[in-house]
Curated annotation (Swiss-Prot):
SMART domains per UniProt: HTH_ARSR
Gene Ontology molecular function terms on file: DNA binding; DNA-binding transcription factor activity
Subunit description: Binds DNA as a homodimer.
Top-rank taxon, per record: Bacteria
Gene name tied to this protein: arsR
Swiss-Prot/TrEMBL keywords: Arsenical resistance, DNA-binding, Plasmid, Repressor, Transcription, Transcription regulation
GO-annotated biological processes: response to arsenic-containing substance
Name of the featured protein: Arsenical resistance operon repressor
Keyword DNA-binding: yes
Chain ranges of the HTH arsR-type domain: 1-92
Keyword rRNA-binding assigned: no
Family annotation (Pfam families): HTH_5
Origin species: Escherichia coli
């Protein structure tokens, strides 16, 4: 995986949906597509397109578990990029944590919901 360039990172994070995905994953560690759709109030196809772009850039990793696909931030993100993400998270920490609290009580992995989008 080639290292992400600064211009590429800022282009990726300039989109509100992609930034939201990255910040939620920074807060919660790992989430499935349906949880991200719920948290961001976006459709599954739109969320999946953004997840694909983030995965292709090397920022995210995914793993399949049955019919669910779970995403997390890659541990191989360059340190400078991780600092950018951390600063973005700090600037929106209260909002991200509020969304995370709501999601934690309703997510498919946290509540044992049998149906995932």
């Amino acid at each position: 995986m080639p290292e992400i360039a600064s211009l590429q990172l800022f282009k990726i994070l300039s989109d509100e949906t992609r930034l939201g995905i990255v910040l939620l994953l920074r807060e919660m560690g790992e989430l499935c597509v349906c949880d991200l759709c719920t948290a961001l109030e976006q459709s599954q196809p739109k969320t999946s397109r953004h997840l694909a772009m983030l995965r292709e850039s090397g920022l995210l990793l995914d793993r399949k578990q049955g019919k669910w696909v779970h995403y997390r931030l890659s541990p191989h993100i360059p340190s400078w990029a991780a600092l950018v993400i951390e600063q973005a998270w700090l600037s929106q920490q209260d909002d991200v944590q509020a969304i995370a609290r709501k999601l934690a009580s309703a997510n498919c992995s946290g509540s044992g919901k049998a149906v995932c989008i």
